[in-house]
Amino acid sequence: MQKVQVHKGDTYFVPAGMVHGIGKGILVAEIQESSNVTYRVYDYDRIDKNGKKREIHFDKAVQVMDMGITPDVRQKPRMVRYYSGCSRELLCRCKYFETERVQVTKGFAFSVLDSSFQILVCLSGYGEVQTMDAEQKPMRFSKGETLFLPARLGRCLVIGETELIKVRC
């Protein structure tokens, strides 16, 4: 195991099988492939909703660990688009998801297609998501909140002054 110095705004891609942990005082948005499996090697003696220590899965975890994975998992954001009122940086893309950092000062338009849902995580500021569906009320959000946008929602518009993580699955 290696300790990695992290800074606000850093992006890391941690592939399946790579043992990892999150240090004290660090807040993360952990985006992962849709799966019901998490193997805990250590859990800081946290308790579950029934007041019992959460289960440790050391033997199962060892079976899926990939010790050959390179520790350099830091991603370099790449500007996707910059225009008046909005900038978009690609943070990470893999076969399961794509994440972007979106800085909105006026508006940001995008589509949620038939194939899958999308997620918006508000890192700072505030705003609302409007859709073309007159029956759909605008969805307001502020720092720390997450919006789930279901498949087939269609054309969306984010209005406000905000920094978002946008996840497309």
Labelled PLM ranges:
Residues 25, 104-134, 143-144:
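Glycine- and acidic-residue-biased ligand/ion/polar-headgroup-sensing regions
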